[in-house]
Amino acid sequence: MSLSSKLTVQDLELKDKRVFIRVDFNVPLDGKKITSNQRIVAALPTIKYVLEHNPRYVVLASHLGRPNGERNEKYSLAPVAEELQSLLGKPVTFLNDCVGSEVDSAVKASAPGSVILLENLRYHIEEEGSRKVDGQKVKASAEDVAKFRKELCSLADVYINDAFGTAHRAHSSMVGFDLPQRAAGFLLTKELQYFGKALENPTRPFLAILGGAKVADKIQLIDNLLDKVDSIIIGGGMAFTFKKVLENAEIGDSIFDKAGAEIVPKLMEKAKAKGVEVVLPVDFVIADAFSADANTKIVSDKEGIPAGWQGLDNGPESRKLFAATIAKAKTIVWNGPPGVFEFEKFASGTKAMLDEVVKSSTSGNTVIIGGGDTATVAKKYGVTDKISHVSTGGGASLELLEGKELPGVAFLSEKN
């Protein structure tokens, strides 16, 4: 699946067309109040571009939260409609459902150039294809799923996907539109361009920075990246499993991943065969408890971590080592912070690493931050706009980096 050959919104003839855009309006809510409108703002360029090209109307659809295939007012998109209306500066019609005869009539009767937001797609079991009942998975029937998809599809001539955060899910709104033109919006196109360049044609040296607790969770990621990168920094909790297996280091009460430990030698063999440099921390900030106000000290890997203590961040020597590795790279993909940045005492390693990748990005290199915790870090320290690309999809970006095909991307039309 080439990421750079997909049809984009700019390839479409939009005049007088009925346009359906799958957006990601899965915003955080406090009751009915939106606490961050970032995802709505991110969709505006695509919506505005379509409106400038005089469509018959624009239908927007999204999920919000996990209503488990049934109506739940807690997850209504009504507050999003209000916020979108004020951001767009034009009326947004909010409909009480996403399929059914009332939706069909309202959409068809809308004035030319209207913007219509449908209610939460996940109110229907047919969107995800299943729901949980008493802890058991209950599947939607194939007939019901086909009917749901057909009803959504009947609202449109053209389908645009701008929801990268859900691109790794084969949900109805991601893969159910039997239309000749299925294009990526600006947000999705940007994701595909950055990941496509890094994974298909990177400017070298190419560095991957990986954090996270368990090696076992990251095996596929490390294995796939070893085929592509020139060097890897391994930080976070999983560094302790590598240190223990490779150097028999004393790791005290730090995270040790038994299942992952069995795979470490194989991964290192592959790294050696591919000529990939693997960089591990050489000192640690350790704590006598996993808590924000724990007692702390710095130890080198030679000293080891004593029993009763655990490593929660890398130390000053590791920061220097990582900085030197980052300084050599021309393309950097970062997925997972190197320490427990949520606690101030253990945030220095993450902050130092962030400073180095910002330096790299502002000097013209390509730096991609995978979504999830690492994107949270960039946001926390206010540097999102100083990084080449901060991904909007944690799970989706991880699966891309693991070498998996994303159903929502594979489903898009190819450029002619």
UniProtKB/Swiss-Prot annotation:
GO process terms (BP): gluconeogenesis; glycolytic process
Compartmental location: Cytoplasm; Mitochondrion
Entry binding sites for (2R)-3-phosphoglycerate: 23-26, 38-39, 62-63, 65-66, 121-122, 168-169
GO MF terms held by the record: ADP binding; ATP binding; metal ion binding; phosphoglycerate kinase activity
Positions contributing to CDP binding: 212, 217, 236, 336, 341
InterPro entries from the UniProt entry: Phosphoglycerate_kinase, Phosphoglycerate_kinase_CS, Phosphoglycerate_kinase_N, Phosphoglycerate_kinase_sf
Main location: cytoplasm
GO cellular component, as recorded: cell surface; cytosol; extracellular region; fungal biofilm matrix; mitochondrion
Catalyzed reactions per annotation: (2R)-3-phosphoglycerate + ATP = (2R)-3-phospho-glyceroyl phosphate + ADP
Binding site for AMP: 213-214, 218, 237, 311, 342
Disulfide feature: none
PROSITE patterns for the chain: PGLYCERATE_KINASE
EC assignment: 2.7.2.3
Residues that hold Mg(2+) according to the record: 213, 216-217, 373
Subunit structure: Monomer.
Function: Catalyzes one of the two ATP producing reactions in the glycolytic pathway via the reversible conversion of 1,3-diphosphoglycerate to 3-phosphoglycerate. Both L- and D- forms of purine and pyrimidine nucleotides can be used as substrates, but the activity is much lower on pyrimidines. Negatively regulates the biosynthesis of acetyl-CoA from pyruvate in the mitochondrion.
Listed HAMAP family: Phosphoglyc_kinase
Family: Belongs to the phosphoglycerate kinase family.
Descriptive protein name: Phosphoglycerate kinase
Designated gene of the protein: PGK1
